[in-house]
Amino acid sequence: MLTLLHNAGEEVWPAVQQRLEIGFNHEQQHQELLLTDIKLNLSTNPLRPAYRSDLHQTPKASAPHQHWIVFPGGVHEIGHQDDCFAYDNEKPRHRTYLNPFRLASRPVTNGEYLAFMADGGYGNPGFWLSDGWSTVKRLHWSSPLYWELIEGEWWQFTLGGPRKLNLEEPICHVSYYEAEAYATWAGKRLPTEAEWEIAARGLPVAGNLRDSGYLHPAAAMPGDGLLQMYGDVWEHTASPYQPYPGFRPAAGALGEYNGKFMCSQMVLRGGSCVTAADHIRASYRNFFYPHERWQFQGFRLAEDA
């Protein structure tokens, strides 16, 4: 690599620089995925070992009362527009029409999700999409991934080992199917990815990201406006992972980076507690299959205004 950088002439430097940027950002993605894989693998060990016993405990705070932030409808532009790096799936920038909507001030908490469970959430097909209900029955889901009921108390497995469930923390490790079922139960819906991006625009990229040292979602701190838009949990949206209007994959191997995955997956936004702060942005599109829940993923609610 050093030889390549030293010998790269002006005529090839733009192509070299492009590939280096993609490589660095791809490495950040793998650093995040390594943590999610480590957690999944350790959770299958009967001894429930900790990845790190020195992780900071999340603050024992009470999540602020949920309120609703109103956003106007109309024609909005979404997608990446700056000169800094972005993946091809964030482009091209384009216009989209939105009706007025309201977005919850924070993600749904563990305690709020427990109310859904107590009301028979995992046993009522009326809350679930057909494929979601089939998944619940086939995989015998009755709670989020890593939750375990021990002597009448809920525990969850973390990268720091097993911990008692903190009801104030954002719900985590739930699939799109579970998020959609909760929203139906609550009489709300999930935001579209365009709604999420419009809401996040102008907010600083700050929060409980990997550098916080928790490697676990934390309860929201008191504040006005939207909270926890970045970090803590990747937020499910109602949007399927599709190419933006005018998207064209690059030629060669670089064109396979995102385009070939634009099928049967759902978009998540905002990063998580294991995402690098300099890796995330308002236009960033993550994507997973609707049944997957090993990633640090949660959700917030939306409704029509």
Regions inferred by a protein language model and the residue ranges of each:
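Short proline/glycine-enriched turn/loop segments at secondary-structure junctions
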Residues: 255-259, 286-293
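Acyl/amide activation-and-transfer machinery of modular secondary-metabolite enzymes
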Residues: 93-99
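Acidic interhelical loop/turn segments
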Residues: 1-24, 210
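Acidic-aromatic/histidine active-site loop/patch
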Residues: 109
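Functional-site microenvironments in short loops/helix caps that host divalent-cation chemistry
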Residues: 23, 29, 33, 37-59, ...
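Short, structured beta-strand segments at or near domain termini in extracellular proteins/domains
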Residues: 294-305
